[in-house]
Amino acid sequence: MFRLRPFHCLEPAELAAFELRIAAYYKSPPESYYFIANQAANQYTPEQQPFHCHLASQTFEGARVLELGCGTAHLCPYVEAHGGIYHGIDYSEALLEGNRRAFPRAVFWKMGSQPQETFDLVASLYTIEHVTDPPGYLQQLWDNCCPGGVIGVICPDFVDGDGIPRSIYYGTSPGRIRSKLASGRLWDAMLHLFELFFIAPRWKSHARSISPGTFWMNLHPSDLAGQEHEIDGDAVHFPRMTDIADWMKKRGAKILATSRTLQNIPPHVIKHNCYVLAKKPA
């Protein structure tokens, strides 16, 4: 079902109902969820994770670093290697308890239980594509950053980057055209082809042509429709680097670096990913 809408076009009741569905999904994610997410996280290298390396290098001795939506906290050892003090926030207490065992010097809080503090560096690594209120999430990053501090966001670029994310499914149900035809679901297969070859390219062209600040949303991710989990199969927000940078600039931030300004980024990284590093006014 290819139906993407700007965030500001969503009805509050519709968004609230969807938030309940996605929250239930994250309370009991597929067993493969964090395994897939962590496959490339064991060792940051400039060739594979140039944005992660650049973000980690912003840490200084004694810096207080917060990752909002920390997952398994694979940023933590790189922060600590630079002399920083890592703090992570997420929803799952079981996940956080595992993090505490893995990284005993770090501090972990369940979302909503953290004290009202600010941090020198606030990081978001592949989280904003999973949130139902992207502007609200950016505001959280902003509010947790101290005056003069730095905010770093790394995520896919589903608008200016290549391809369409896997959370999109075509037709009336997830699955391949071949299986739809084999099972006699002809209308599903026909709609699949129409959306794949006509609707999706037109959306991509339109989304790239408009001004920043749209925050495209997908309230029908394939993971919630029963498809076996793939990376970004649960993506509900389609990030765009210029959306994020524009949001920061409108609040007076200085953009220190982006995926477009850093030099020597490998093509296989830049074609799918983006990065914004912004300095909050002092």
Please provide the spans of the model-predicted regions.
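Conserved class I S-adenosyl-L-methionine
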Residues: 152-192, 203-209
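Substrate-binding/catalytic lobe of Class I Rossmann-like enzymes that use SAM or dcSAM, i.e.
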Residues: 185-237
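Conserved N-terminal segment of class I S-adenosyl-L-methionine
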Residues: 1-114, 125, 237, 265-266, ...
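Conserved S-adenosyl-L-methionine
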Residues: 253-263
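A short glycine-rich, Lys/Arg-flanked "PGG" loop and its adjoining helix->strand segment in the class I
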Residues: 135-147
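Acceptor-substrate binding/catalytic loop of class I
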Residues: 159, 166-170, 227-242
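A short hydrophobic/small-residue beta-strand
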Residues: 86, 151-152
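A short SAM/SAH-binding and catalytic strip from SAM-dependent methyltransferases
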Residues: 121-133
